[in-house]
Amino acid sequence: MKMKIMNVCSVALLAIGIWACSGQKKGTANVEVATDSVEVTADAKSVQADSTGYIVRVGEMAPDFTITLTDGKHVSLSSLRGKVVMLQFTASWCGVCRKEMPFIEKDIWLKHKNNADFALIGIDRDEPLDKVLAFAKSTGVTYPLGLDPGADIFAKYALRESGITRNVLI
């Protein structure tokens, strides 16, 4: 069952990515992304990131965190151990996020929200509660959204200065 969820989530994320990128205007250049890693030093701490800004690599243990959801509940990643977990890093100012969230709602959340082996958390990057609630309402999402003040959770998974949207399957 977990593999089925992973497959559905992977296909949905791939479709969302292709759809989001398909809006390029004719005549725009395609950019080839290198897979080299980049080393960034911040506050005497060296961080290895890939060319897209990800710090966490496939096969590595996902960094634990505790997040406060918009309903006031607290959830830690470690409490979800054994489940398929999707983290959707987002923000109200992110145009791609606004486009993908209704698809995540329909194609992933509504299909799997009652599955005890699945969890989805939207993680809003550095915005206040009222803005996150308005964002959820405007995009029509009902899946859990959490607050990431200072983008500290985001920084465990990707470089702070790298872009969002970012989706992580664990």
Feature locations, PLM:
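N-terminal targeting signals for export/organelle localization
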Residues: 2-62
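Thiol/disulfide oxidoreductase modules built on the thioredoxin-like
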Residues: 135-142, 148-170
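Conserved hydrophobic packing residues within short motifs/helices of P-loop NTPase cores
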Residues: 87, 121-123, 168
